[in-house]
Amino acid sequence: MMQPTPAPSSAPGSPQRTQAEPEMETPSYPQPPQNVGTAPFSVLVKLFEKLATERKQERRRKLLDAWFRHWRREKGFDLYPVLRLLLPQKDRDRAVYGLKEKNLAKTYIKLIPLGMRDPDAIRLLNWKKPTERDKSSGDFPQVLCEVVSKRSSVIEGTLTIDELNEILDDIAKNMGKSDVQSKILRRIYNNSTADEQRWIIRIILKDMNISVKETTVFAVFHPDAQDLYNTCSDLKKVAWELWDPSRRLNAKDKEIQIFHAFAPMLCKRPTRKIEETVKAMGGSKFIIEEKLDGERMQLHKRGNEYFYCSRKGKDYTYLYGKHIGAGSLTPFIDSAFDSRIDDIILDGEMLVWDPVSERNLPFGTLKTAALDRSKKENNPRPCFKVFDLLYLNGMSLLDKTVKFRKNNLRHCIKPIPGRIEFVEEYQGETANDIRKRMEQVMENRGEGLVIKHPKAKYILNGRNTDWIKVKPEYMDNMGETVDVLVVAGNYGSGKRGGGVSTLICAVMDDRRPDSDDEPKYSSFVRIGTGLSFADYVWVRSKPWKVWDPKNPPEFLQTAKKGQEDKGDVYLEPEDSFILKVKAAEITPSDQYHMGFTMRFPRALAIRDDLSIADCMTATEVFESLKSERKRKMEDDAGITTKKRKTTVKKVALLPEYSGPNLKKVAVKTDIFNGMKFVVFSDPKSRTGEADKKELMKTIHANGGTCSQIVNKNSEAIVIYGGSITPYDLKLVIDKGIHDVIKPSWITDSVTLGEPAPFKKKYFFHATEERKYADEYNEDDGEEEGAVPSADEQERDVKSGTVEPGSETEDEDEEQAPEIKEEQDGELHEWLKVDDRKSPALPAHDEEDSVTEDDSDNADVADEEEPDLDDWFQVKGETEDEGAGALATASRHRETTPDVDGDVKMGESEEAMDYDPDVIFKHLCFYLDSPANAQRHGMATRPKYEAAITKSFEEVEKLIKDNGGKIVDLDEPKLTHVVLDKRDDSRRVELMKRTSKPRRRHLVLSDYIEACIDEGTLLDEEGESF
């Protein structure tokens, strides 16, 4: 079975288009309405500033609506020039500028100009680093604005909206040409004020922070704008198709179209317990799929033409092939399609398959595989794993059921192993069916499953209970993580001082009766551990506002007494973010509006891929409580009666991970003669160790030597091809002595027959000395979507800081809604709000049930579910026939082990939180040392026993010094099992022995040191098995 490979949310491993690549088919657009002119960019800047500082969401809508109406009245009905600047992240025509904060800083230093030792030059280059004097640190556009304002002589900007769009078009067209882009940016510098440049830089960085969501902009622009965008992912088409606010789309216009990118359906976040997922299926048999972590991809085919694009609408046809004579995939899959197909759209995941090792390679190799034009049979290649059929022979299948679509999918495609395959799927009926499949996935180092209701329809850009992710249940969390909204914060002290260090989080209160009021949020939990230094830099750059106890935020409901949920500062929901949190349990508390809080909470990640609409609701909190109480009642009633047997199983040893035996590898060339290498494996890749061995063999075969250890004074070249920085590699990087090179340098050198130049593109991390080398700087620029290097892995700091105390005074509830302007009469007209004209907004769907149809195409759904016999003569909804039938999972009833009482985390019942200064307090660790393994009847590897024993002695001291407890394998409160990477042969057995009542985290010993270095509890995923 093919295994999934890790994939970042924004597809950083995916390649970017270059000038040499062929132009893609130009989309057809309706004739745009003609404007009578444009407007000064300054009036749009005034709108940005009003939106960014306005507290009330309804007032922001009215401001936006007033501005749109004035444009239509004075300039015309073509709002595309404005929408491109309001929603730069949605502008496909300017997908890439090739300019990030670092490049912009260097460019501005030259064009101002500033000396490299000038304090402002240093400030621009080090904009992320917080200082006591520099309150705007972490917000690059604001830092730039302050630097420019000291030197710019422009009092009034002269750029118009059309001129700015032309300038931005020129910057995008000249991506990678720094000299040309610098000249274009000089036009901006010479013709706009410092404040205007601040907003232009926000547009270039595609990070506006104007407190207005994309859905709000679309809803104000036109009632059908969001529906149309979901079907085409094309801002220009939305602007020109819907220029008339009074014209409504018909149902056909909201369907997907061949060769038009659409916003795919997504999975709902996992439920707290697997039983809840089963319940959400409404008693139906359901479909179980393994969750694949490749790159989400849609494939369109019409006749002999193909079109590929990502979840975000990025066109990858140039990579995979527009026709059978082009690309790295199309020539090999054309024969897989049934000859009766005229046109078809498939949804699936793009992976990288290695025919030699018969497994998937790390996601970072997708670019190399996709660009490979050699067509050699044994080279790694893209493989498309299909899980849905959405369009067939002119008919949209969005309103058909999953079962129907899958049944017909198997009659449309004949799988070609390693090229195009179906996602493996099983039928389930009980929670035990899911757990059985989860056990298989976990043993294969997978990360989860997707459960689908067989009658689910396909909802564009939708996320409901018809598709649910399932992840394993762990001892130190409630069975799953939750996504909560950060609403407020408290300042830290001591080593955590200098800004916000504790975050107050809330859930959306969906218990309130339906009304036109803005959503309210109920305080729920405080988080003080789990985030890294880079995360805190990003968090502190947010536009925090001072908390006024006499006038607290209207959207936030807090406890009547107590101070736990009262912050020093707060964030408006539109400026906030979702935090992924795990905790031991939910417990009663009168310190939060919910009446409950989380015990031992800690942050796992900032979910910048989620919107505030993905926030956990109050109803979901109470559902979690109900299911937990039910579980306890069942335990007390003795439903789980069978105790686990203590029979010890002997397990087979896994291959050694010290490196391959190179004695039998013949040396064929002297390409790497005299060069020494240390190869690191990718901990996120299931084939990491195997990939490492193959690379070491390649090095040896070409004259190089390999070592296992990086010595301080060694001149060894470090090789690493992952996307994260494992702890042991971080230690090497921190020394500042060694470069870290990507494996592509090895393969390219072998191809060239000599060592390839050390260009920037080959570096995962470069030392400061290397960065000044001519060879290193030969590259024209970085590619969009490239896997981030170690130097770039700190979170990109978001902009939009509002200094405490800088906001305008809160408005009285009875204040008239008309906005008072101190500007001239013309500007006043742009922002004049008319209460009688409030844009209609689509209603929010509250019901996620499969019985409630929330499809955009509900108005055209047939009363009966026809099959596609008219097109294809295939089977319909029957369960039995042929290729459309699902493999049936075993449904035998499994018994669960008895648990002596309700085991709770913590040293006492009263303990509620982690201690940020004693990070392992309340956690219990089992060390998989050779002595412990032998005592429990498990085999060990004698070769490493002494070294591993000594290492575990040091790990034990670190754990104890930081508040943790060392326990035995059968300790009920056990939370972590620590292994040494030199001998992980007992991983599967330890996983089985510690999986009840919930799984324990299996981590490498490096995880302990990484936590101590960061001063917080890190997410175990990076160092787990």
Swiss-Prot record:
One of its GO terms (molecular function) is ATP binding. The keyword Membrane does not apply. GO terms for cellular component: DNA ligase IV complex. Mg(2+) 1 binds at E349. Gene3D superfamilies: BRCT domain, DNA ligase, ATP-dependent, N-terminal domain, DNA ligase/mRNA capping enzyme, Nucleic acid-binding proteins. It is found in: Nucleus. Its EC number is 6.5.1.1. CDD domains: Adenylation_DNA_ligase_IV, BRCT_BRC1_like_rpt1, BRCT_DNA_ligase_IV_rpt1, OBF_DNA_ligase_IV. Its cofactor is Mg(2+). It is an enzyme of class 6 (ligase). Belongs to the ATP-dependent DNA ligase family. DNA ligase involved in DNA non-homologous end joining (NHEJ); required for double-strand break (DSB) repair. This is DNA ligase 4. It comes from Coprinopsis cinerea (strain Okayama-7 / 130 / ATCC MYA-4618 / FGSC 9003).
